Structure formats: structure tokens, C-alpha cells
Amino acid sequence: MKIRLKFEKTNLIRLIVAMIFAAVLYYKVTFPIYVLAGFGACYFLIKSLEIEINNKWLKLALNVVLLGGSSAMTAHMVQYLLLDAELRARIMDNKMFLNVLCCLVVYLVVQVFTKNVGLTCIISHMALMIFAGINYFVYLFRGNEFIFSDLRSISTGLSVAGNYEFVLDDRAVYVVLLSVLYVAFVRKIHVKFEKRLWMAVVCISIAVFCCAYIGTETEGTVTETWEQKGSYRNGYILNYVLSIRDCFIAEPDGYSEEVVTELENQYSGDGESYVNQNIEKKPTIIVVMSESYADLSVVGDFLTNEQVTPYYDSLQDNIMKGHALSSVFGAKTPNSEWEYMTGNSMAFLPSGSVVYQQYISDTPTSIVSNLKNIGYTCVAMHPYYETGWSRNAVYPTMGFDETHFIDDFDQTKLLRKYITDQELYESIVERYESKKTNEDLFIMSISMQNHGGYTEKYPNFNEQIRTLGASYSDANQYLSLLHESDKALEYLISYFQSVDDPVEIVFFGDHQPSLNTNFYKGLNGKGLSGLTEDELENLYTVPFFIWTNYETETEEVPITSLNYLSTMALERAGIALPSYNQFLADMQQTIPAINSRGYYSVSSGCFKHLEEATGEEAEWIDRYQILQYNNMFDKKKQSKVFFPYLQN
């Protein structure tokens, strides 16, 4: 083996190019000047390096060291990119070793298709670092990590990416510079496996062994999706692998056709005991799922220069009003609309999954199909692109008669980059006014105005609200958007107060926004880490109301969850509950709120994880999970009593 330095003019040219690249990074992200100088010196030395290896056993040993060492280096660089020193220190050694093995599997699989170990290392390292970079920005934008189920959401993410600011920190710059040095070094090592078939067999065998070992060691490991827990508890690469595992839904304990039949026998009536049937005319039902609409005071108290939502706060007649648990934070809106429309819960699905893109069947029974079965015309409105979250495919399957997307709205009526709530509500009014005589109308609308992020400034948006004391620009913009939503809401309610036909309006937020961590720390004293279950559920709490333009009892609801809201809306409208909604109405008495994080225990007076449930609470949760599994995954034996879908 011979190692020598050979200085050439071409290396100086390469150095100049590399230093220009590094200088641009230095301009974008200020870091110590000695790092820039050190990078230049190392790069020039590496490019001037010549390595010659003749001994075949030394080549073999170098191949092994290069693959194993590169895997370990990549795994640690991923962690360095994503976590600060304090969080990096939290991961246990055995989990870090599993992350190295995950990276090694990638290297081995790539090696099967290449003879050159250096090329394998470059491809594998760059692929894994780009992958980690995607997670770096995803976490920056939405406050939780990129996992396997997000792959189906790439088109949606790209469509709103322009509204976010892409910012690198110093760790990201160091990772980029170190990767450049690594690639330059590996290119200097020219070693190959001469016997390709033998090499492929060995690589595949080791990869299979690694996968089996990882599977055995992680059998009881939970995929983490909250904030950066996946990275500092499991390691990001391993956590992502676990999210792949979670896409396969297992049959719940105690599931059988006989158990479903027993439940059918309990809920096969007409539901008249649940609702008031003395209604002369079915009401028009309008649902507004308001993008990122939240009452941040549930997280902690704060002061503003003006009241944020004065009109919403003033509503008190003919209204059921309160707070509901969502299953998502900062993103994944369709899971909230799915919970509302179907009555199902994300509690029994893998963390981070998106139902619209993974689990929608050909016959998804919901409030849409139920209302359509009793003569309603069902309309969906969303002032954004139809391909977002695959809504253009999902909505017709759900049974909607009409769908209205961005091209059906006035695209000059924008606040920041999104169509305003006012324009959405005017479109709702327009559709109501154009309805046929005796047409029963159901409108499901999803707004877009308040979508994150909240850091960029816009000439078409005058921010009126600001927090007093510590001020955060993203929080001020978000609260100002809520203030605009409140004005639009007043228009919507005022209009339908004046019409003669009965109208019910259901309004709720899909999830809380992802804002500056320090802002949350000012609210609850902790930020987003180290929270109790009750404090964590506060971040998943959104406001809701069910209002009618005719006389109904005013009711305050301390806590419920989105999966119950459609049942509550049907009850309030005087419409007979289908069997599944009857079940949910009964369950709500014992389990008033349930979401992806846990449930509210009436007996204990606090939130708990599902696995902590005992007695009657556990029985209701088990029945719920059995029915949801039957609905979504046991198509051959799907209950026609609970899930009739469309009857016409």
C-alpha cells in the first residue's frame, strides 16, 4: 500500500471551486472562519492524495472497513444534523447501533449492484444524507418528523413549500462540508470486489441477518412521531424503518365475526330513541373545518393588543360549543376531516399515517353516505388544489355529488398566498342560494387561509394582532389570521341568521399551528418537550361549535373529540342516528374524548394512554377498535348494519 501527496494545478482549480461553494454557505450561515480555512486545507490535501493498493487481502479488509465505517459515520452524521448536543446524548448505545445497522443494510444493497466500493459509499451516503435533509426541513416546517407514510404526501407538501423559508443552521453547514470531504476522500480509494457473484451473496446474507436482528431487537419499540422524539429516542433512520413496519395493520385482540354480530344485535334498531324525530323539515347542514384554527389559551395564558376572536367568543345562543381533541398537530389536515366524517379514530392507526392516501376503501361509510341515503345533496368545497391529499380521488368515493376546488373560486381574493375564508363563505352562500326547491343540502368545506408557515411578510396582509410582552413574529401573524377568520365567520353566521329555512353550521379547527418553540415555552413553561399527558393533549385541542338558526338548547362541552362531532351534529339536527353513530353516542358517555395520543378517563379525571384503560373504559375502546377494523380492513365480513355505505 502506497500513500503520497501529488500537487497539481488542477487541484488548485478544484480548491477554488470548493472554496467558492463554502464561501456561499458562510455568507448564508455565519460560522467560525477557521472552519472555512480548515475545510479548504483538508480539501486540498485530499485532492492531492494518491493511494495505491496492490495486496488483495488488504483490499478486502479495506472494503469491509470502508462499508462498515461509512455506515457508522453516516448514521452519526444524520443524528448530528437533526439534533443538538443535549438531544443527541439521549439516545441509548443499543439504539445507535441499530441505526448503524440500518445504514449498513442500505450500503450492502447498493453494493450488490456495483463492483466499486467507493461508488457504493458515495451513492449510499448521499442518498441517506439527502433523506435526512428532507426530514430536517419537514421538522422545521411542521414540528414533527418525516416518516414512511409521508411519501404519499410529497405532492401536497411541495404545493405549499413555497410558503416556507428554507434556513440552514451551522450544524447543517458542517454536515454539508464534511460530506464534500468524505466524497472527495472516497473517490481516491479504488477498490473493488473481483468476484461479483460471491460478493452479492455475502452482501445479501449480511443484509438479511441485519434486518432479522433489527426486527428482533425492536419488537417492542414504539415509533415516535411527536416533535423530535423519533430521533433522540430511537435514532432517525431506525424510527423511519419502524414507521414502515407500522403500515401493516394487525387484527385487534379479541376480533371475530361473532363479536361483530353481537354488537350488530345491540344496534340494529332505527335509532329513534336517540333523537327528536319531531322535525318538519331537514336542515341544511354546513360544515366548516377551519385550517389551523385554534384557541391557544388552552396551552397557556397570554395577552394581546386586541381580542383575537371577539365574534366567536360572543356566540352564545342556539349553540353547542366547546373544545375537541384532534389527532394531529401542525399538519395532516385530512386526518381531522376523516375523523369528523367517518366517526373513526386515528387512535387505532399507525402514528403519522394519512388515511386518505393509505386506507380509504371503495365503500367508506360516513356522514356523507348516510346523508345521501336520506336524500341530501352532498357538496365538498376546498379552495386549493384538488390533488392535495388525493382529495380528487377520495371525495367521489366518499359519495360527494359535487366537488369544488381552487379553480371554482375567485383567485384574486387572497390573504398572503391563500384564498380567504371570506371567499369560501361567499361560495357557500352562493351554493345555498342556488339550491333547488326542497333540495336538502350538506356542504363540507375545508378552508385554506390560515395555513402555515407564518414567518414571511406579505404586502396584502396588515397584521393587526400582536402579543404583549415577549413577541414572536410567527405567533403575531398567526393570531392576526385568526382575527381575519373571525370577521369572515361573522359574515357567515349573520347571513344564515336571516334565512327562513333551518340551517345548522358545524365549525371546528383541524389542528393547532406549529409555532416558535419559545412561544409555547412562554405559554406552558416547558415548550414542546417534557410534557405530561394532560399538557400534551392541550396541544391537540381545538375549538368547535354546532350552531343553528332555529331554537336549540345552548350547551357548553368541556371536552370531546373530532370523531364524535358528526354524531353530535346529526343529533342536534334531529336526524335519526345510523347504527354506528348510535354506538358512538353510547361510547361517548364513558369515553368523552379519544385521539391518537390517548383518551380522557372520566373515572380518573385525566388523560391516559389507551393501554392504560381498565374496566368499562377498556371494554368500550376494544369494541370501538373491533368495529373500526371491521369497517376498514375486513372487507369480506364488513358489517352491513354498521357500515351500509350508499344504498342507492
What does each of the following model-derived ranges do?
Residues 2-231:
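Transmembrane and membrane-interface helices of multi-pass
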Residues 8, 137, 141-147, 169, ...:
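A diffuse structural propensity rather than consistent per-protein peaks
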Residues 52-59, 237, 241, 248-265, ...:
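Extended hydrophobic/aromatic-rich secondary-structure runs
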Residues 3-30, 34-52, 174-182, 195-196, ...:
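N-terminal leader/auxiliary helical segments
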Residues 268-280, 290, 295-648:
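Solvent-exposed soluble domains appended to multi-pass membrane proteins
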Residues 151-154, 234-237, 241, 309, ...:
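Alpha-helix initiation and N-capping motif
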Residues 213-287:
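Membrane-interface segments at or immediately adjacent to transmembrane helices
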